[in-house]
């Protein structure tokens, strides 16, 4: 089974790119609440972003591999006023950047899917827990299940959240 964990609530800082945000300590209890829902003996991997690595540290005492390709959809801008509408544009037109400096969503899908394929191959028959990001997990689940990206689910993702896929 593949366990995709969206990171805990970040401490959002205007002027600082989201890839550098850390967890908001006020949300630690929400992260700890997921611990019992995750398999202790699984293979654990995380995005390199601080909020993802910090989430992993709160969820397991075991080793967690860091995989650069699990990072979120790359977004150079530190703050986008209409974030949800901009990401929805990325889903509607995945081959073009939805905002100046953003990675096309198709590139994110290809990068994350390749990385997860490698993890699953290396741990065939084992559970895997991956700590990462909402947009990346949404396109990954779409790819793994052969279904369109579930934008309603993406909008409803909590900090943290858990998606399971029989992979």
Annotate the PLM regions.
Residues 1-65:
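Active-site-proximal alpha-helix that buttresses catalytic centers in soluble enzyme cores
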Residues 2, 42, 126-134:
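Generic beta-sheet signal
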Residues 9-11, 50-51, 71-72, 134-137:
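Short, solvent-exposed loop/turn segments at secondary-structure junctions
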Residues 17, 22, 59-114:
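Phosphate-handling substructures
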Residues 38-40, 119-126:
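Glycine-rich phosphate-binding loop signature in dinucleotide/nucleotide-binding domains
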Residues 46-47, 110, 131-132:
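Short beta-strand scaffold positions
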Residues 58, 139, 143:
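Active-site signature of alpha/beta-hydrolase-fold catalytic machinery across serine-
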Residues 145-167:
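Domain-level recognition of soluble alpha/beta enzyme cores
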């Amino acid at each position: 089974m593949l366990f995709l964990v969206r990171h805990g609530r970040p401490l959002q800082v205007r002027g600082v790119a989201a890839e550098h945000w850390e967890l908001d300590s006020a949300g630690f209890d929400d992260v700890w609440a997921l611990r019992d829902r995750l398999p202790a003996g699984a293979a654990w991997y995380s995005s390199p972003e601080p909020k993802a690595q910090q989430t992993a540290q709160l969820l397991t005492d075991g080793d967690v591999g860091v995989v650069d390709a699990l990072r979120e959809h790359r977004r150079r801008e530190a703050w986008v006023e209409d974030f949800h509408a901009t990401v929805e544009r990325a889903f509607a037109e995945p081959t073009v950047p939805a905002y100046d400096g953003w990675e096309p969503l198709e590139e994110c899908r290809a990068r994350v899917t390749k990385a997860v394929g490698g993890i699953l191959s290396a741990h065939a028959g084992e559970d895997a827990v991956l700590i990462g990001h909402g947009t990346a997990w949404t396109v990954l689940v779409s790819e793994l299940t052969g279904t369109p990206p579930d934008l309603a689910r993406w909008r409803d993702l909590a900090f943290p959240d858990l998606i399971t896929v029989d992979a």
